[in-house]
Amino acid sequence: MRDRVLPLQGIHNFRDYGGYSTRGGKLRTGRLFRSGQHVDATPSDLDLIAALNIEKIVDLRGNHERTLYPCLRPREFSAEVLFADGETAGSGNAPHIEAARDVATAEQAHAAMVRLYALMPFRPKLVEVLRLYFGALAESTGATLLHCLAGKDRTGLAAALLHRLVGVHQDDVMADYLLTNEAGNMERRIAAGAETVRANFGPAMDDAAIRT
């Protein structure tokens, strides 16, 4: 599973989520990519992305996140970027930041994320960009890139929906979703998330809650 992960320096959780067996065959590799945001992409990261020949990018973030964390793009970038004009998360922040409000322990963090996942499929702007995502997959003849802020919750939901739609086995769907917990430099990613959460809500959240 880990060989799906591309070794980028400034982009978290960049990986290929194709290659799985389906009801009618197998998803192609080199066509379906997912990641976190690209605001910290290095020049070598951008060169690698350019070599993937990505035709469409689906940005699951809302307006607030896209303004705070503008993505860097390769030279001669020509991919079409699809997004919803509005907020795809309830507070305008990424789901893991939204869920962190009034959370101090791992148990509270888990309960908050369960509540958040129950709400995500019914958020109008997220549903809007998911429609764009599936439309892009139906129309595209090249590679697509799916991303949000952390490349975890909204991106994980969208990738899992695609996998289930085409008949990827549930065990593979779950394994791909959970690969986020191992992809790339986890400690660095957790540290970045902790900094953002504590900057928004103060230092009360313990380390176990951050990792939940």
State what each model feature region is.
Residues 150, 154-155:
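Ser/Thr-glycine-rich phosphate-binding loops at phosphate-binding pockets of nucleotides
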Residues 1-145, 157-212:
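Cys-dependent protein tyrosine phosphatase-like superfamily
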